[in-house]
Design a protein with these regions (language model features):
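Hydrophobic beta-strand-centered segment that forms part of the acyl-chain substrate-binding groove
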Residues: 578-587, 591-637
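Short, well-ordered beta-strand elements within core beta-sheets of diverse protein domains
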Residues: 31-38, 54-58, 132-133, 153-154, ...
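Rossmann-like NAD(P) dinucleotide-binding subdomain of oxidoreductase/dehydrogenase enzymes
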Residues: 119-278, 332, 410, 463, ...
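Catalytic strand-loop segment that frames the active site of acyl-thioester-processing enzymes
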Residues: 527-587, 674
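C-terminal core of ALDH-fold dehydrogenases
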Residues: 366-382, 413-505
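N-terminal Rossmann-like NAD(P)+-binding subdomain of aldehyde/semialdehyde dehydrogenases
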Residues: 1-137, 322, 339
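ALDH superfamily catalytic-core signature
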Residues: 197-202, 228, 237-391, 412-414, ...
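HotDog/MaoC-like acyl-thioester-processing domains
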Residues: 530-540, 623-677
């Protein structure tokens, strides 16, 4: 008897006492593992996440959490062979497995990088600029993101047992939210194998990850307003979750990513001899056959000009006829099995419904020639290509979650846009065209109905990641039928798991709360130049108030001649006098910034290693000849790097003139040594 899959709950592995039900190898029908409906104490798991996992994560900064994800991905990479072998048993070929396993690990690496590069080494994220709420500047506001004291529950689909878990885990983890993972039963044995390697790594804070295998009945019953549920699956199950009392009235945040009727449009400019024609045909066949079409982003609707329908149909048939279907671990096989024979029956039913208004032009839903396996024992199915009758409704309503696509024709670009919208909301759409006007009309017309749109042509094809590939840095989700949710998107995905709050108060209070110097807060001007302080000595608010410098006409003339910037406002007195903004010769803005640097820089070698940029530079008041300027430089944000002997310091710079008017404001970015801790 095969082993019964275990759950990981409250810090230990839970083994069901019953034999459970068999999970079949998609290729052979043999039992891979068994799954029980009897799981651990769900309420206890939720409480453990809140009281153990959450506090442990929130003790860490964003950078520390991100570094854990990086090390975790490196650890998992060492077990790829183990995961690949199990993935093949789900029906996934090597190409399919790369999308799931390698794609999952790549998502961890990507979020780790984003977290370390775009978030502070802190526990609070500032959102947007400071809002001035009073004339005197004593009452201000700042939007911030903070970590929720809740739990992220993920309910995943069967098609991506690795990527589906990790793409939800990564942003939640960086946000400081512990996760409870509920994998789909059919492929849960692969998820269990990955989680076991994650737990044994010792990298994850206790309680930050738990795994619930089997029935998820009651999973939402103990959730509340600080908790988030991320669901991937069918629209019907999504509707059931939306109607749960804790979602309807209990404040539980639900993010739904549902399967959708994604389309790919062939532009009216494309002819059979164009590179875009081959790109289109190849893309459709790829999306039909990767994961045997069991992808929420697969192309279900092939929207082509009526004049090109025959050519596209013939080309698709030519490519599909070369696709070998069979055992996932056979190197000659292009398309593997569906996840189960039950799933194959579901696809066959959907194909039958589609055929009420569409002609079958390739494939046979009932039989297929199989390589390296038995067609009856495994869950194999032929790729199916249909061609819809004019005005057919079924292709826009019925989804066959398998290797099935339907050709739909259009006569005008406006009609193509309308057909795309009839899907009632999709995760992704694509357009293959080399006409910029067509691209503009189609993309702007279909964007409200899509979470992502790919425009493919000869220029980007070589480096394109393809129609069906969600990327960690781009949002994944879609309106309407696609669930109305949104995930991934780099730091956007992290913030989705946090709470945004507007904090009002005095500048000093906001500085104390956020750990970020706020305009109007106290400044500390001491005897030691801030550039002589390493990160262990430097404090938020440390300031240098510079000496003064007169900007002479000779300075302006020299800068113009030396740099070649001879714009008339700096060189032509008559023209400059006629300018309504200047009324005479003015100094270059970059001259003012350069002179300011000369006023605040401490030149000798010291803790400051480099200036690596300037942010938010604004020139506010023209500086005329003989103006007297000075600069105030204040340590605004200190971000130690966790894996380096230096960190980043952001300085608030304000250049003022003899009338104490601000002439320039900006942030100076420096790298500063940590020193001895």
């Amino acid at each position: 008897v095969s082993e019964v899959l275990e759950s990981y709950a409250q810090g230990s592995w839970f083994t069901p006492t019953d034999e459970g039900s068999p999970l079949a190898d998609a290729n052979t029908g043999e039992t891979v593992a068994r799954i029980s409906k009897n799981g651990p104490d769900v309420a206890g798991m939720v409480e453990y996440a809140r009281t153990v996992g959450g506090p442990a994560l929130r003790e860490l900064t964003f950078h520390q959490r991100a570094n854990i994800l990086k090390e975790l991905a490196k650890h998992l990479m060492g077990y790829k062979d183990e995961f690949y072998a199990l993935s093949h048993r789900t029906g996934a070929t090597a190409r399919d497995t790369m999308v799931d396993v390698d794609g999952g690990f790549g998502t961890l690496f990507s979020f780790s990088s984003k977290g370390r590069r775009e978030l502070p080494n802190a526990k609070v994220i500032l959102d947007g600029p400071l809002e001035q709420l009073s004339k005197g500047g004593t009452f201000v506001a700042q939007h911030v993101y903070t970590s929720r004291p809740g739990v992220a529950v993920q309910i995943n689909a069967f098609n991506f047992p690795v990527w589906g878990m990790l793409e939800k885990l990564a942003p939640a983890f960086i946000a400081g939210l512990p996760s409870i993972v509920k994998p789909a039963g059919q492929t849960s044995y692969l998820t269990v194998a990955v989680v076991k390697r994650m737990v044994e790594s010792g990298l994850l804070p206790e309680g930050s990850l738990q795994l619930l295998v089997g029935s998820h009945r009651g999973l939402l019953d103990d959730l509340g307003p600080q908790d988030i549920v991320g669901f991937t699956g069918s629209a019907s199950t999504g509707t059931i979750l939306r109607n749960h009392p804790n979602v309807v009235s209990g404040g539980v945040q639900l993010n739904v990513e549902a399967d959708s009727l994604n389309c790919s449009i062939l532009g009216p400019d494309v002819k059979p001899e164009d590179p875009e024609f081959d790109l289109y045909v190849k893309q459709v066949v790829t999306e039909m056959t990767v994961k045997a079409g069991q992808k929420c982003t697969a192309i279900r609707r092939v929207i082509v000009p009526t004049s090109m329908a025959e050519a596209v149909t013939e080309a698709l048939i030519g490519r599909l006829s070369k696709v070998k279907v069979g055992a996932a671990d056979n190197p000659d096989v292009r398309m593997g099995a569906l996840v189960s024979q039950d799933q194959r029956e579901e696809v066959r039913k959907a194909v039958k419904a589609l055929r009420t208004s569409s002609e079958l032009v390739f494939g046979d839903p009932e039989r297929v020639e199989v390589t390296g396996a038995d067609a009856e024992s495994g869950a194999f199915m032929s790729p199916i290509l249909l061609r819809a009758e004019p005005g057919a409704k079924e292709p826009h309503d019925v989804e066959a979650f398998g290797p099935v696509s339907t050709i739909i024709t259009y006569d005008t670009v406006g009609e193509a846009v309308e057909l795309a919208a009839r899907g009632q909301g999709s995760l992704v759409g694509s357009l293959v065209t080399n006409d910029e006007d067509v691209a503009r009309e189609v993309v702007l017309g279909t964007a409200p109905w899509h979470g992502r749109i790919l425009v493919l042509n000869r220029d980007d094809a070589k480096e394109s990641t393809g129609h069906g590939s969600p990327l960690p840095v781009l949002v994944h989700g879609g309106p309407g039928r696609a669930g109305g949710g949104e995930e991934l998107g780099g730091v956007r995905g992290v913030k989705h798991h946090m709470q945004r709050t507007a904090i009002q108060g005095s500048p000093d209070m906001l500085t104390a709360i956020t750990g970020h110097w706020t305009t109007g807060s106290r400044r500390a001007i001491g005897d030691v130049h801030p550039f002589r302080k390493d990160l262990t000595e430097l404090r938020i608010g440390d300031t240098i108030a510079s000496a003064e410098r007169t900007v002479t006409r000779a300075d302006i003339d020299h800068f113009a001649e030396f740099t070649g910037d001879t714009f008339y406002a700096h060189t032509d007195e008559e023209a400059a006098a006629a300018n309504p903004l200047f009324g005479g010769i003015v100094a270059h803005g970059y001259l003012v910034v350069s002179l300011a640097a000369g006023l605040f820089v401490d030149p000798a070698p010291g803790p400051v290693l480099a200036n690596f940029g300037v942010d938010h530079l604004r020139f506010l008041t023209p500086v005329k000849e003989d103006a007297v300027i000075k600069v105030t430089l204040t340590a605004k944000q200190i971000t130690p790097r966790t894996n380096a002997d230096y960190g980043e310091v952001r300085w608030d710079a304000v250049v003022t003139d003899q009338n104490d008017e601000a002439v320039a404001t900006y942030d100076v970015l420096t790298l500063v040594a940590k020193g001895d801790e």
